[in-house]
């Protein structure tokens, strides 16, 4: 079997215009490289999920996970976003950081394994950047139905902040979206005593609403803060008071706060008002024990290869790692520096990709 270098793999992956949920042929290319792995295809509603798996012995099952889909490139690039450009030690293309660099490193690392006391798998989806409804979670549901869930997982999201090796994600905040609608009575602005102005009602308590911290955070999570993202009401005229006003907000919550806490807070704050509240939990927070084998072994490999002692954090947005946690699989995340995610002229350091490959290899060898 021919050996594929991680940079060669990355260069080819970046050419695929795999905008969610279209893989654009990327999975066929990966299948060609991992042709001695068992291949399991789990496709649903236009989303492709593929598991490449190989059993070497009776021991633990470690899964490397990621996504091959990317967001649209937009305009303003200095080069073709799907024709990778190597310049001054960087590769420029859409998906370079998020996250084809990690996928390439994972493919290279697992393809070269000769001996391992257990099972190694690679779980890839074409729907992480979109709704992610039929992506990684569907693949894990399938594995659960067969009693084949992995014991540990590494997700290759770009986790590093300023120096390669500085950050391992051991958890993520949850995300709860809400819409609060204050109801009033519409009327003529000249007769405020005959109206019930919902804007005034909202404003009277708004200082206690916007920016509210539901908890004080802990060693791994920042406080769960209510962030207002939009306010709408009225008819865009100056002589009619509105019948209602709506506030859209989001709470990135720690494991100390849930939807009931948010509901109870708003119910109490606006208890004397006529209002409607809609909350939607889009993801739950999770935290992997820092003493878990996957966290400790990954940390050792990162420090060994990069020379940097990583910190364990939970910051940033949501990721597919939450689905592994949902299925009680210990999971940690590690990848390249994340300074150009979804940006024009997205790029990744060649040196980082090479080191990332070595880290994944070292993790397998010493697990």
From Swiss-Prot:
Class of the enzyme per the UniProt entry, highest EC level: hydrolase
Its cofactor is: Zn(2+); Co(2+)
Top-rank lineage group of the source organism:
Bacteria
Q: Which UniProt keywords apply?
A: Amino-acid biosynthesis, Cobalt, Diaminopimelate biosynthesis, Hydrolase, Lysine biosynthesis, Metal-binding, Zinc
EC id? 3.5.1.18
GO BP, one example? lysine biosynthetic process via diaminopimelate
- Pathway, per record: Amino-acid biosynthesis; L-lysine biosynthesis via DAP pathway; LL-2,6-diaminopimelate from (S)-tetrahydrodipicolinate (succinylase route): step 3/3
Report the co-factor binding details: Binds 2 Zn(2+) or Co(2+) ions per subunit.
Q: What does this protein do?
A: Catalyzes the hydrolysis of N-succinyl-L,L-diaminopimelic acid (SDAP), forming succinate and LL-2,6-diaminopimelate (DAP), an intermediate involved in the bacterial biosynthesis of lysine and meso-diaminopimelic acid, an essential component of bacterial cell walls.
- The entry's protein name is Succinyl-diaminopimelate desuccinylase
What are the leading ranks of the lineage? Answer: Bacteria, Pseudomonadati, Campylobacterota, Epsilonproteobacteria, Campylobacterales
């Amino acid at each position: 079997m021919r050996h594929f270098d991680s940079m060669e793999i990355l260069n080819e992956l970046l050419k695929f215009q795999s905008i969610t949920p279209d893989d654009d042929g990327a999975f066929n290319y990966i299948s060609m490289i991992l042709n001695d792995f068992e291949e399991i295809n789990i496709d649903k509603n236009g989303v492709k999920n593929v598991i490449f798996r190989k059993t070497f012995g009776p021991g633990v099952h470690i899964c490397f996970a990621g996504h091959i889909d990317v967001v649209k490139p937009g305009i303003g690039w200095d080069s073709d976003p799907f024709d990778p450009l190597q310049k001054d030690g960087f590769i420029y293309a859409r998906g370079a950081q998020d996250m084809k660099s990690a996928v390439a490193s994972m493919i290279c690392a697992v393809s070269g394994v000769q001996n391992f006391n257990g099972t190694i798998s690679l779980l890839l989806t074409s729907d992480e950047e979109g709704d992610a409804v039929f992506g990684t979670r569907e693949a894990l549901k399938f594995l659960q139905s067969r009693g084949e869930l992995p014991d540990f997982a590494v997700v290759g999201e770009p986790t590093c902040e300023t120096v390669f090796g500085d950050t391992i994600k051991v958890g993520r905040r949850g995300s709860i979206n809400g819409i609060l609608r204050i109801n009033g009575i519409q009327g003529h602005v000249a007769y405020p005593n005959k109206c019930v102005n919902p804007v005034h009602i909202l404003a009277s308590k708004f200082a206690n609403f916007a920016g509210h911290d539901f908890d004080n955070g802990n060693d791994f999570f920042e406080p769960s803060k209510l962030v207002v993202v939009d306010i709408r009401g009225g008819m865009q005229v100056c002589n009619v008071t509105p019948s209602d006003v709506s506030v859209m907000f989001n709470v990135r919550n720690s494991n100390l706060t849930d939807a009931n806490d948010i509901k109870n807070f708003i119910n109490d704050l606006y208890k004397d008002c006529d209002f409607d509240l809609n909350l939607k939990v889009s993801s739950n927070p999770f935290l992997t024990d820092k003493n878990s084998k996957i966290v400790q072994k990954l940390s050792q490999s990162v420090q060994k290869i990069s020379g940097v002692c990583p910190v364990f954090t939970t910051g940033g947005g949501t990721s597919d790692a939450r689905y592994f946690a949902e299925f009680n699989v210990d999971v940690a995340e590690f990848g390249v520096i994340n300074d150009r995610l979804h940006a024009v002229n997205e790029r990744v350091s060649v040196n980082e990709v090479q080191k990332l490959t070595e880290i994944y290899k070292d993790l397998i060898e010493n697990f």
